[in-house]
Amino acid sequence: MDWILICKALALGIVEGLTEFLPVSSTGHLIVAGSFLRFHPEQAKTFDVVIQFGAILAVCWEYRRRIVDVVTGLPAQREARRFTMNVVIATLPAIALALLFEKTIKSVLFAPVPVAVALVVGGAVILWVEGRQRERGKPSRVQSIDALTPLDALKVGLAQCFALIPGVSRSGSTIIGGMLFGLERRVATEFSFFLAIPVIFGATLYETAKDWHAFNVDSIGLFAIGLAAAFVSAFACVRWLLRYVASHDFTAFAWYRIVFGLFVLLVGYSGWIEWI
């Protein structure tokens, strides 16, 4: 296997793992990184599906005990059924809109200006929500995932719909949306992790079924390297983020989004990257 391709696979896997669960938009980062690394567009499209799968496996591993407890508790435990129902309720709106508007989103919004605007506006929204949190000066209404109501889950699910716009960030929309609707910062972050499981698994299955011909024996090694890199980096990132939100807000990520959005606009129109 070509060592240059191995390095590219490692780099893209790490980028995916580090950005998938932070409120910074993994899509924007992968587009820029993939173009700089000169990944072939079709190869990059398939590879993105694989490394996303690696990232979500990291969340499954981090929360494996909770997931097992929920699955085994479904027949008899009310808490397990309520948790599952909340995840389903929060997942359905985005899935419905994605199926309805997938082609429109890809044809209209995958361009430098929409992605850059989404990054910058998302950063501004984070600054506003964090400022609102400081002004309130009192504890958030929902202090535990188990205290989430179906209405809370629906609100977070509606917020997740904004993530269909490239550059918004699925994690950003669910975490910040959750905080806006009364979830404590860590609760919003953890619920965002759990929502990623059905969303990314579903997207992986859908894209794999649609482009199954792109998966061939020659690419298995490259995909395995990218998946492993995404898994390890995502696992480290998830653990770090849980520690970070215990004593920090998301203001730094907001400013990063704004700067990165301007960078995307610059490289998109300068010809430095090939926009997919």
From Swiss-Prot:
GO terms for cellular component: plasma membrane. It is found in: Cell inner membrane. The lineage of its organism: Bacteria, Pseudomonadati, Pseudomonadota, Betaproteobacteria, Burkholderiales. One of its GO terms (biological process) is peptidoglycan biosynthetic process. Bacitracin is thought to be involved in the inhibition of peptidoglycan synthesis by sequestering undecaprenyl diphosphate, thereby reducing the pool of lipid carrier available. Keywords: Antibiotic resistance, Cell inner membrane, Cell membrane, Cell shape, Cell wall biogenesis/degradation, Hydrolase, Membrane, Peptidoglycan synthesis, Transmembrane, Transmembrane helix. Its EC number is 3.6.1.27. It comes from Burkholderia thailandensis (strain ATCC 700388 / DSM 13276 / CCUG 48851 / CIP 106301 / E264). This is Undecaprenyl-diphosphatase 1. Pfam families: BacA. The keyword Cell wall biogenesis/degradation applies. Belongs to the UppP family. Catalyzes the dephosphorylation of undecaprenyl diphosphate (UPP). Confers resistance to bacitracin. Its main location: membrane. It catalyses: di-trans,octa-cis-undecaprenyl diphosphate + H2O = di-trans,octa-cis-undecaprenyl phosphate + phosphate + H(+). The chain crosses the membrane at residues 85-105, 108-128, 187-207, 217-237, 253-273.
